[in-house]
Amino acid sequence: AISLLMCLILSALCASSESAVVHGDDFAAERAVKSSPYLVLSPADEMVGMSTANEAFDKSPSYYDDDDDDFVNNEKRRLRFHKRRIRFHKRPQEVSGLKPVMMSRASASADENSLFDLYNTDGAMYQRELRAPRLRFYSLRKRAAGDEDKAEEHNPETESHSRRKRSALTPSIRSLRSSLESGIAKISINQDLKAIADMLIVEQKQEREKYLADLRQRLLNKGKRSSEVALAASDKGDEERELLNTLSNLLE
């Protein structure tokens, strides 16, 4: 009996929950759980749809309000945005001085291979030549110059658009070559200066040795002559003998 009573109570609760309907202005459609099986009504008690189909969120009163002020504000905002886009599309023509190209709807839609639609949803025409990315083009004379900078890795047309751009930390081959040549030139200059200095030192040493040899020879000649004179004249004084002894000692 107790189990039968419990089954009846559960069946009554399930029936009441399935037939329950939410009313009132205090109910917020945004707060409803998407998996809820209840029917969601608008504040005006108009049927919107099942929340399981996400229609209550798409057609909530906050987005579809029947108030005239909100509708006028939304319309003004849409028109302002539309005028801004039209002015943005007309700006490149006024700056560049190009005449507006008039294209019919049929001719614009006839290009099936086009990657972009020529007309947007607001009616502004998409102009491919004005919206294309700006590329730097150079004359054929500069391209065919044959210089090292015009190689494939140094092509000025593709250098700015390449993924691997050369930075200041990775210099080019030409700059490395120039720096290496300048370094070699500095080394050679330093070697030349060192050789010149060594040569001057050797020359000075040779001149000094030659001067000392000449001085020694003159002193020897003078000593010999003085010794011969001393032997010839034996009556010289003691001072001259001491002088001769000192000279002989110096020569030795």
UniProtKB/Swiss-Prot annotation:
InterPro entries linked: ELH
Modified residues (Lysine amide): 222
Alphabetical UniProt keywords: Amidation, Cleavage on pair of basic residues, Hormone, Neuropeptide, Secreted, Signal
UniProt region (Disordered), positions on chain: 145-171
Any coiled-coil regions, as ranges: none
Signal sequence region: 1-19
Residue spans of biased composition, Basic and acidic residues class: 145-161
Tissues and organs where the protein is expressed, per its UniProt entry: Bag cell neurons.
GO molecular-function term, one example from the UniProt record: hormone activity
Subcellular localization, as worded in the UniProt entry: Secreted
Cysteine pairs bridged by disulfides in the record: none
Main location: secreted
GO biological process, one term: neuropeptide signaling pathway
Gene Ontology CC: extracellular region
Residue positions assigned to the propeptide: 20-75, 92-130, 144-185
Function: ELH acts as a neurotransmitter locally, upon neurons of the abdominal ganglion and as a hormone by diffusing into the circulating hemolymph and modulating the activity of other organs. It specifically causes contraction of smooth muscle in the ovotestis and expulsion of the egg string.
The family this protein is said to belong to: Belongs to the molluscan ELH family.
Name of protein: ELH type 2
Gene: ELH2
